[in-house]
């Protein structure tokens, strides 16, 4: 059996093109999307990830703001910063970069981000929506996997064990 080659860069570029059109429409209506990246402490992998985020959002016209906090920041201070971003109408998306220092409760801080501003889809509400097949605000990794599968042209609706042979025959 041979596999299907999936070119993630092609899929990513298609997504970026669609997002750019949506962002342009929002800007024409007077609404400029802004993503805030919260980074706590120093981590070279996170630094690289943030640079890639900044590059990609600039490609589609989204404003990018990085909020850096020292590793010894308190939970209360991070919580307050997130709450302030939640109520700021200029901020349309928030992402909490991981890993964060071990003394901070990632689950609690992630749950502090309002579900409508939770870019990663890690708020408990967003994760719960998966059960109801509401992926509009789902976890970004899961949505990326679905987009990659869609890029193959294979039908992914209603797949179960009884459909496995059809899927296997199309991938040979």
Roles of regions detected by a PLM:
Residues 59-61, 84-87, 113-116:
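Non-catalytic terminal and connector segments of soluble metabolic enzymes
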Residues 162-172:
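Single conserved hydrophobic/aromatic residue that forms the stacking wall/gate
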Residues 57-71:
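Short beta-strand elements in bilobed, periplasmic/extracellular small-molecule ligand-binding domains
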Residues 1-29:
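Positively charged, low-complexity intrinsically disordered leader regions
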Residues 77-89:
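Short, well-structured alpha-helical segments in soluble
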Residues 92-163:
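Anion-binding alpha/beta catalytic cores of soluble intermediary-metabolism enzymes, centered on
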Residues 32-41:
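Short beta-strand segments enriched in small/hydrophobic residues
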Residues 47-60, 170:
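Short, solvent-exposed amphipathic alpha-helices that sit
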């Amino acid at each position: 059996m041979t596999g299907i080659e999936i070119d993630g860069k092609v899929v990513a570029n298609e997504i970026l093109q669609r997002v750019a059109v949506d962002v342009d429409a929002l800007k024409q209506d007077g609404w400029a999307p802004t993503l805030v990246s919260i980074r706590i402490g120093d981590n070279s992998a996170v630094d690289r990830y943030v640079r890639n985020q900044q590059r990609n959002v600039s490609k589609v016209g989204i404003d990018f703001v990085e909020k850096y906090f020292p590793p010894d920041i308190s939970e209360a201070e991070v919580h307050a910063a997130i709450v302030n971003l939640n109520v700021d109408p200029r901020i349309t998306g928030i992402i909490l970069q991981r890993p964060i220092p071990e003394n901070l409760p990632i689950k609690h801080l992630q749950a502090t981000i309002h579900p409508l501003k939770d870019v990663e889809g890690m708020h408990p509400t967003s994760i719960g929506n998966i059960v109801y097949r509401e992926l509009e605000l789902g976890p970004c990794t899961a949505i990326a996997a679905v987009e990659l599968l869609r890029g193959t042209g294979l039908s992914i609706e209603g797949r179960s064990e009884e459909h496995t042979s059809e899927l296997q025959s199309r991938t040979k």
